[in-house]
Regions:
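Residue-level micro-sites within transmembrane alpha helices that shape
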Residues: 12-15, 371
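Bacterial N-terminal signal peptides
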Residues: 14-27
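Bacterial Sec-dependent signal peptides at the C-terminal "C-region" and cleavage site
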Residues: 26-34
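N-terminal secretory signal peptides that target proteins for export/translocation
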Residues: 1-13
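Generic low-complexity segments that are intrinsically disordered, proline-rich and/or Lys/Arg-biased
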Residues: 3-5, 21, 69, 81
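Glycan-processing catalytic domains of CAZymes
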Residues: 33-430
Length: 430
């Protein structure tokens, strides 16, 4: 087994060697994606970034700043490396780096931006994305339009690059009285009007398109166990006017015992166990290798035993690190505004989780997240040094913790994780 230091050296050299090939365009003819979650690395894809004027109507920065573009209103923790983009495809913030160069960001509304993201995934053999669709956004015409646009870009890019995609409904911030009804209505819209599951790239599993429900059962999220169970049942069976789906549950880590981050009402035990696949949210649940090892012992291994008993799938979550100083500072929560709260440690933290999960018998992984710079979990290319941050800001870079890494380092680790799963691809013994 590679030591942590050897792991760093291995990936650094591999990324440097492969870098010239990273963006080579290879034309793909869209064809049906191989079925099944087993043997896949799926990355979460927010697709929520925006710039004023990016869709002809938007007048605000979306997820880059809370207000005008200024150091004090910055809400992201680390900047993406955009050296492969033309400036005409980017947004000039008006800010300057410490060396005087302009700071650019991107809009997820730009199809060329999304296409490049998928080219990166293809170059590293990352299987595809779970596109995060916020249920609350589907209830507002302007926000739904933006989500629809990005979903179309995701579909086209996945088809072009031979990647897969599926939709994740995130219930965060949705009213409990409307959340289930909104999911029902939007799934009808996506499968009916948008015909999203007819894409050759839309992932299927067990003969049905994959759909994830994320957030039911968390202590601070909406939904009742009865309503969630009924929704899951209708989706699995294709009843109540809903298109059939294989339903993945993005659940609390305490789902099995109704403890920790899970609600404790008895009805949640049956709700969780009615999913086709369980994917417990692990981000922030531990901060170092020792914590990850305890998580493997206390959560992953018992979870796998339980899901095998239930004859359902299991897809653990891995993440590179965590930090949300700027976001929490803007929200007026200084006690949570901690820079580099969970250090990435040059990639060793992420790789340790990957080997833990695979060593426990997991055959699919969810990596959080491809583009989440708000909470510092992004896997796509990132700025490598503090000198690349806007003047007057406090931000992370890949140079944190004394690391000397290329900007695509974490794509390389994700690709290595994907290839590890591909080598083990096959039916799970349940």
């Amino acid at each position: 087994m590679l030591t942590p230091s050897a792991t760093v050296i291995f990936f650094r050299d591999a990324v440097r060697v492969l870098a010239p090939l990273l963006f080579v365009f290879v034309a793909f003819t869209a064809q049906a994606a191989p079925a099944g979650l087993d043997g896949r690395l799926i990355v979460g894809y927010q697709g929520w970034f925006g710039c004023p004027g990016d869709d002809g109507e938007n007048k605000q920065w979306q997820h880059w700043f809370d207000g005008p573009a200024a150091p004090a209103s910055l809400t992201v923790e680390i900047l993406p490396s955009l050296r492969e983009f033309k400036t005409t495809d980017l947004c000039d913030t008006g800010l300057k780096r410490r060396d005087g160069s302009a700071v650019y960001v991107f809009s997820s509304q730009n199809p060329r931006v999304v296409a490049r993201h998928f080219e990166w995934m293809r170059a590293q053999s990352i299987d595809g994305v779970a596109f995060q669709r916020f249920v609350s956004h589907t209830q507002h015409a302007d926000l739904r339009k933006r989500s629809d646009n990005v979903l179309r870009h995701v579909r086209a890019s996945a088809e072009q690059t031979g990647r897969v995609f599926y939709v994740t409904y995130d219930v965060s911030g949705t009213d409990e009285a409307t959340v289930v009804g909104a999911i029902r209505a939007d799934w009808k819209y996506l499968t009916g009007e948008m015909k999203i599951t007819q894409s050759a790239a839309y992932l299927s599993d067990r003969g049905k398109p994959v759909l994830q429900l994320w957030g039911f059962g968390f202590k601070d999220h909406p939904g009742t166990p009865e309503a969630a169970t009924a929704l899951i049942a209708d989706l699995k069976a294709g009843t109540a006017g809903l298109a059939k789906a294989t339903v993945v549950g993005g659940v609390p880590t305490g789902w099995r015992t109704l403890s920790s981050d899970s609600r404790s009402e008895p009805g949640w035990a049956a709700a969780y166990r009615s999913y086709d696949v369980i994917s417990p949210w692990a981000v922030g649940r531990f901060a170092d290798d020792q914590g990850a090892d305890r998580f493997r012992r206390d959560v992953i291994e018992p979870d796998i035993a339980e899901t095998r008993r239930l004859h359902i799938g299991y897809m653990p979550v891995v993440f590179p690190g965590f930090s949300w100083r700027n976001l929490m500072a803007r929200r007026g929560q200084p006690d949570k505004a901690i820079l580099n709260q969970i250090p990435r440690r040059c990639g060793d933290f992420l790789w340790h989780q990957v080997t833990n999960a695979a060593g426990s018998g997991a055959t699919a992984l969810f990596a959080a997240m491809f583009d989440e710079v708000d909470e510092g979990t992004a896997l796509f290319p990132l700025e490598t040094g503090a000198d690349r941050s806007p003047a007057g800001t406090t931000m992370l870079s890949l140079g944190q913790d004394g690391c000397q890494l290329p900007d695509g380092w974490y794509l390389g680790i994700a690709g290595k994780a994907a290839r590890l799963l591909h080598e083990r691809r096959g039916p799970v013994k349940r």
